[in-house]
Amino acid sequence: MAVFLVERSIPGMSHHDLLLAARALEESCRRLAPGRVRHLRTLQVLGGSRCLSLFEADSKDLVARANNAAQFLFSSVEEVEEVVSRGGDRTDLP
């Protein structure tokens, strides 16, 4: 499966509302296509009015459909590639 980054503008959205929206994303992924689209995490840009969500999915279309089903508006959906793993190691080194 590929990884996708969803960017959205969230002016005036509280932390609590963002938590509820992230839960709605998780639920819409489970209902829409179990095992084919999964919400990994949502990050809020501090001091700004944006958030970024990561998804693992079979297609960009599935990610867009999951976001639409959760009624969480977004600006873009792009496929991304990990450059540094969680442990801090580069993924392209032997």
What do these predicted regions represent?
Residues 72-84:
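Conserved short beta-strand edge segments in small beta-sheet-based binding/regulatory domains
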Residues 36-42, 76:
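A short linear hydrophobic-aromatic micro-motif
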Residues 1-31, 40, 48-49, 60, ...:
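Short S/T/G/P-rich N-terminal loop/turn motif that feeds into the first structured element of a domain
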Residues 54-56:
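Short hydrophobic/aromatic beta-strand micro-patches
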Residues 32-34, 69-72:
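Short, well-ordered coil/turn elements that cap or connect secondary structure elements
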